[in-house]
């Protein structure tokens, strides 16, 4: 019990920061201004020198403290104005400031953790979204069961504020944060998903931080239980969840938690050293080598944690536990599954001969051709059947710019999908882009494709669509034709990919 309490207090003791005063520091909004794509956000009203000003932020905070302006309905948020600015404008400004300020203590903790673990030099590789695939290739071939879980969202923002108070000790800051959320109370109800979507679009950085913090909170509990399950004797979760009774303000939440979780459905620690957890975008994967009933225990743990701690509903029947060899899952724009390679080995012992069947598991990571064609069709590179079409909106650009745009898209997709087991789908996507580029240039010059290729030279035209991959590999490996040919067929994961391609959608 003491070890559990020490674990809970360790992270909390590092977060003795005072953030309230930073809200009134002009350089904080300068940082937000430099990170914002819309640079006109912090521009003063007509009559000023087009400089961002802290005055408009102070005006908004003053207004939020006025009782008659505390709550503003969503329907009137675009109509009401204050000194020439609407409420959406002020909300975006103050949310950018909140995002910058509240990220500071967590960034300091992350840097400290990386330095303690002596992995700061490798941090960039860990940030790569493709670093997950070598892990899957090394670990998942030894596992038997997998569960693909969608993380439930949205969550009530008041619960997030209460949890955030556990990590950062600054009452005035959270008082101001609550005022900001109350000013937009129509956007923080979980019943109105359209309002949540609107709120996230108006305040993308603030919304992203709240979501990441929510995921970090439930994962910290999960990681603690996972680490302790291998060397602790059987005991209940009650010791760990004592903090909920202290921080939960609503009485019905405490009663619900005590009744439905701690007593009737109390889970216990169990030894499962071969369980692996992977999170990506809004989903997570739980895989294990042991029997499925252990996976079922973790499944119910997640469900009751979300329902009782975060007060967000999750359906048990939406979380399925499947044999890994019979289940494929979507992961960062790839289709992934485990394929069984069966081979027969002849063994001879003295005068007896035996035929032994050997089953080798191999993970297959392939390019999903149909979702990619739908993305290309949505971007007007082809139709829904995958037939290339011209892109007239680019016809006003020069030939060099048109070719450069298509080449950049083709290279990015080739770079992103280089780890695929089968390259046939990738070659088809590159062919669609190549022919779409030719049709766009022919449309610009008011000519047919055949006449344009005849005039330009079909052999030399757009040859970079097929050579850029070999040129990149030749800079890394020896210029041996057999080596490059072998590497072009094998998987190569690039650990410099920090963002997914715009055409990649993990539905």
Curated annotation (Swiss-Prot):
Belongs to the intron maturase 2 family. MatK subfamily. It is found in: Plastid, Chloroplast. HAMAP family: MatK. The keyword Nuclease does not apply. One of its GO terms (molecular function) is RNA binding. Disulfide bonds: none annotated. GO terms for biological process: mRNA processing; RNA splicing; tRNA processing. This is Maturase K. The gene is matK. GO terms for cellular component: chloroplast. Usually encoded in the trnK tRNA gene intron. Probably assists in splicing its own and other chloroplast group II introns. It comes from Lens ervoides. Its main location: plastid.
């Amino acid at each position: 019990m003491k070890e559990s309490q020490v674990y809970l207090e360790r992270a909390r003791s590092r977060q003795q920061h005072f953030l309230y005063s930073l809200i009134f520091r002009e350089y904080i909004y300068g940082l937000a201004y430099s990170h914002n794509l819309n640079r006109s956000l912090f521009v003063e009203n007509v009559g000023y020198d087009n400089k961002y000003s802290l005055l408009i932020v102070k005006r908004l905070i003053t207004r939020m403290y006025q009782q008659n302006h505390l709550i503003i309905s969503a329907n009137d948020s675009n109509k009401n104005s204050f000194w020439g600015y609407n409420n959406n404008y002020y909300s975006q400004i103050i949310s950018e400031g909140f995002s910058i300020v509240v990220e500071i203590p967590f960034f300091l903790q992350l840097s400290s953790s990386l330095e303690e673990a002596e992995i700061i030099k490798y941090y960039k590789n860990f940030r790569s979204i493709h670093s997950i695939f070598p892990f899957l290739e090394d670990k998942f071939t030894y596992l038997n069961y997998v569960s693909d879980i969608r993380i439930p969202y949205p969550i009530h923002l008041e619960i997030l504020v209460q949890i955030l108070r556990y990590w950062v000790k600054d009452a005035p800051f959270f008082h101001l944060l609550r005022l900001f959320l109350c000013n937009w109370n129509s956007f923080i109800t979980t019943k109105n998903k359209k309002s949540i979507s609107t709120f996230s679009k108006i305040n993308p950085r603030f919304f992203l931080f709240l979501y990441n913090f929510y995921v970090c909170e439930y994962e910290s509990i999960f990681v603690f239980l996972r680490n302790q399950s291998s060397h602790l004797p059987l005991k209940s979760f009650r010791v760990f969840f004592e903090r909920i009774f202290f921080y939960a303000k609503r009485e019905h939440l405490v009663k619900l938690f005590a009744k439905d979780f701690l007593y009737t459905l109390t889970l216990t620690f169990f030894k499962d050293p071969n369980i692996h957890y992977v999170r990506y975008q809004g989903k997570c994967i739980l895989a294990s080598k042991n029997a499925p009933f252990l996976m079922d225990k973790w499944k119910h743990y997640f469900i009751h944690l979300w329902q009782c701690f975060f007060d967000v509903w999750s359906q048990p029947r939406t979380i399925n536990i499947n044999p890994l060899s019979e289940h494929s899952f979507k992961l960062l724009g790839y289709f992934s599954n485990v394929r069984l390679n069966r081979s027969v080995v002849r063994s001879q012992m003295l005068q007896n001969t035996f035929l032994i069947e050997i089953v080798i598991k191999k993970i297959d990571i392939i390019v999903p051709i149909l979702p990619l064609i739908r993305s290309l069709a949505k971007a007007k590179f082809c139709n829904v059947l995958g037939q290339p079409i011209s892109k007239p909106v680019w016809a006003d650009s020069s030939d060099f710019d048109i070719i450069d745009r298509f080449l950049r898209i083709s290279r990015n997709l080739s770079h992103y999908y280089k780890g695929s087991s089968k390259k046939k789908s990738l070659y088809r996507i590159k062919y669609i882009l190549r022919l779409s580029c030719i049709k766009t240039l022919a449309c610009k010059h008011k000519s047919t494709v055949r006449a344009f290729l005849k005039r330009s030279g079909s052999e030399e035209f757009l040859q970079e669509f097929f050579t850029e991959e070999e040129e990149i590999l030749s800079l890394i490996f020896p210029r041996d034709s057999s080596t490059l040919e072998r590497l072009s067929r094998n998987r190569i994961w690039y650990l410099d990919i920090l963002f997914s391609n715009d055409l990649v959608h993990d539905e």
